Amino acid sequence: MGEMGKAMGLLISGTLVYYHCAYRNATLLSLFSDVFIVLLCSLAILGLLFRQLNVSVPVDPLEWQISQDTASNIVARLANTVGAAEGVLRVAATGHDKRLFVKVVICLYFLSALGRLISGVTVAYAGLCLFCLSMLCQTSQSLGNCVLKRGNGQILEQEAHSDT
């Protein structure tokens, strides 16, 4: 799936989560429960249908496992992110870097004020929208550069043929 497909899928999923949590005033736990109930019922109906049609579906549990390297990579990335955030906060708290301290304090005050004005779900959804927008812009820029290169190549080829 391309970057644009990932961004659109993420945006659609985020919109559904935002609707469920913000407008229905439901919790995230309620959303996960609803999703698992729908998946369980759908799988049960498909199982009954396949049994009725005498279709055998092989279930290989090894296909659903991730490798140990993948699991280690996920944990290492999470640990690096938490470690980097902890390092920034430690340097800011000691006061060795005054500019970093001021930036952290301003960001924390801004987030505190934002949290009092609007709900956390709205902030998370706005962040998701901005993230998807940046993914779409990066994809469109790379497509634009590709088109420009092709266009310039065709123009250069036409000029070369017209000179001869």
From Swiss-Prot:
Residues 1-164 form the Reticulon domain. Its main location: endoplasmic reticulum. GO terms for cellular component: endoplasmic reticulum membrane. It is a multi-pass membrane protein. The chain crosses the membrane at residues 30-50, 117-137. It is found in: Endoplasmic reticulum membrane. The keyword Cytoplasm does not apply. This is Reticulon-like protein B22.
